[in-house]
């Protein structure tokens, strides 16, 4: 009987050690909606890099969705080793829960944003509605597809880009911008929860005349549906800076801090920057950016800091409960 008990104890210990080892070698990246293709290729490259560096194998798990929803999932217990989200406010929200150091943005270069993007338009082939700039989105008879700013990071970039366009026009101010964005959302027939869902609504389901899209998502749609859609680059747009960080409490518990740190640092490596550029994210590395310069349209860009005073201020004013978006978006009206 003693041998049976000892054998059972040993077996339980082996199972526990096996589970711990598996946890240490499997990294969960919780990301925003349209990064699937980017991280599929990047992860494969990092697996080779890590094997060469450490002699150890590593596997990845993925979770993709609207950036705000993803942040909430991590706060509620999704065991992300790293988060690669659409905007800094969503990581700040996780930090407020105690899972991430509040000074997270200082840990990596460029405010922990290894690549940038912007917002462009995707229109039907031949641009039958003649959409050229933000002002065309409020015309009668133009249906605009954009995700829900309450759940999607990309949608918040869309909203803020439209707001600042209106504010910078002749005679523009916050009141005029509010009128403009309110008119724009009256032309939105449906709000998907994330950017990929909005792309599916526009490209696959054929709803709408114009999609407000991440630049990389627009180019991916062109690659897959070049006979159905075209890209229109507006006169002005926002510099979107998707940030990344390690989830401190999770990596401490799982023992994955070294791997998670190396994973995010590798995004800044020449190979990581090349992969980002190949997937139409604007690289930070100047040499890689110069190599891929012809991939990206020249567009006047403004930052959220200069236009809105940063994400905390923008979130409080526009996207918090009873904020400007809640005031202007009236479905069915």
Labelled PLM ranges:
Residues 119-127, 241-258, 275-279:
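A bilobed periplasmic-binding-protein/Venus flytrap-type ligand-binding module shared by bacterial periplasmic
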Residues 169-235:
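Ligand-binding pocket segment of bilobal, Venus flytrap-like solute-binding proteins
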């Amino acid at each position: 009987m003693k041998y049976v008990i000892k054998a059972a104890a040993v077996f339980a210990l082996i199972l526990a050690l096996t589970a711990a080892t598996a946890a240490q070698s499997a990294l969960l990246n919780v990301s925003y909606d349209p990064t699937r293709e980017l991280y599929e290729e990047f992860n494969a490259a990092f697996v080779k890099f890590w094997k060469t560096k450490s002699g150890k194998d590593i596997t990845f798990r993925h979770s993709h969705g609207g950036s705000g929803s993803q942040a909430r999932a991590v706060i509620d217990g999704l065991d992300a080793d790293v988060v690669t989200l659409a905007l800094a406010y969503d990581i700040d929200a996780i930090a407020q829960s105690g899972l991430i150091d509040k000074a997270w943005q200082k840990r990596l270069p460029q405010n922990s944003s290894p690549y940038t993007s912007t917002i462009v338009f995707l229109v039907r082939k031949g641009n039958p509605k003649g959409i050229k700039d933000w002002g065309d989105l409020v015309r009668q008879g133009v249906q605009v597809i954009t995700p829900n700013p309450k759940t999607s990071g990309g949608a918040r970039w869309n909203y803020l880009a439209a707001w600042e366009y209106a504010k910078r026009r002749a005679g523009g101010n916050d009141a005029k911008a509010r009128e403009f964005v309110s008119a724009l959302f009256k032309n939105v027939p449906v709000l998907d929860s994330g950017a990929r869902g909005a792309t599916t609504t526009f490209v696959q389901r054929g709803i709408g005349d114009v999609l407000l899209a991440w630049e990389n998502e627009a180019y991916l749609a062109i690659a897959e549906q070049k006979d159905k859609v075209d890209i229109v680059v507006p006169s002005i747009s926002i510099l979107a800076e998707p940030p990344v960080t390690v989830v401190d409490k999770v990596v401490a518990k799982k023992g994955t801090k070294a791997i998670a740190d190396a994973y995010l640092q590798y995004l800044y490596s020449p190979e990581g920057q090349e992969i980002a550029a190949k997937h139409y994210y604007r690289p930070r590395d100047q040499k890689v950016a110069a190599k891929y310069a012809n991939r990206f349209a020249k567009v006047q860009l403004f930052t959220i800091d200069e236009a809105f005073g940063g994400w905390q201020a923008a979130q409080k004013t526009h996207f918090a409960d009873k904020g400007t978006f809640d005031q202007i978006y009236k479905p069915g009206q």
